[in-house]
UniProtKB/Swiss-Prot annotation:
Membrane spanning residue stretches: none
Protein name: Homeobox protein Rhox5
GO molecular function, a single term: DNA-binding transcription activator activity, RNA polymerase II-specific
Location within or outside the cell: Nucleus
Function noted in UniProt: Transcription factor required for differentiation of embryonic stem cells (ESCs) into primordial germ cells.
Chain intervals with Gly residues compositional bias: 52-62, 70-84
Organism: Rattus norvegicus
UniProt GO cellular component terms: nucleus
Tissue and organ distribution: Highly expressed in placenta. Lower levels in testis, epididymis, ovary and skeletal muscle.
Residue ranges of DNA binding: 119-176
Domain of life of the source: Eukaryota
């Protein structure tokens, strides 16, 4: 009896295992069928959307073309950017105006340079020649009035101007003598032979005269 019960239990367990395997296989099959149906439905929706909106594909191709061209889209005079024909014309006009503005300045500089070139340069040889001529006149004439008048005519100075300079030189010399201290030879300061027997504070006869 016990052997029959155990065999019955084993057969029942085997049947249960077979049923479970068949159920698992059936479930996997149903899952595969559902997945295929879901994917087919999704593809159909994508195709319908693409047919319903034909502009999206064109926009996508245009976007790809812009990316390939480095991000530059439409071209023309109205489009802002360095490639537009309007900007090119404006750039050429601006450059032409700048050149016109710079042309007068260049002409002025050229005229100044030409004037500088035309001005005669003073050479040291001419000055030395004049000095030699003046020295020759002074040596030949001495202190005569004719020689002085000749020198005045040579350096184009009138007698009034010469007298004015003479007065100014005399006044300058007089004021300079007054400003300089007059040296006093005293017995205590220096051994002057004329002041050896003189008393303290007696003025030396060789001192410069006071004014």
């Amino acid at each position: 009896m016990e052997a029959q019960g155990s065999s019955h239990d084993i057969s029942r367990l085997l049947c249960l295992g077979v049923k479970e395997d068949s159920e698992e296989q059936h479930g996997q099959y149903l899952g595969d069928v559902k997945a295929e149906a879901f994917f087919q439905a999704g593809e159909g929706r994508d195709e319908k959307g693409a047919q319903g909106q034909p502009g999206e594909g064109a926009v996508g191709t245009e976007g790809e073309g812009e990316e390939l061209n480095g991000g530059e889209g439409h071209f023309g005079p109205g489009v802002p950017g360095p490639v537009g024909e309007g900007d090119k014309d404006g750039g050429t006009r601006a450059s032409g105006m700048e050149e016109e503005q710079h042309e007068p300045v260049a002409e002025g500089t050229e005229s100044v340079k030409s004037e500088d070139k035309q001005m005669p340069l003073r050479r040291p040889g001419s000055t030395q020649r004049r000095l030699a001529e003046l020295e020759r006149i002074l040596l030949s004439s001495g202190s005569s009035s004719g020689g002085r008048s000749l020198i005045d005519g040579w350096i184009s100075v009138c007698p009034e101007c010469r007298n004015w300079f003479k007065i100014r030189r005399a006044a300058y010399r007089r004021n300079r003598r007054r400003r300089t201290p007059i040296p006093e030879h005293f017995r205590a300061t220096s051994g002057c032979p004329a002041c050896l027997g003189a008393r303290w504070g007696v003025r030396c006869p060789f001192a410069t005269p006071r004014f």
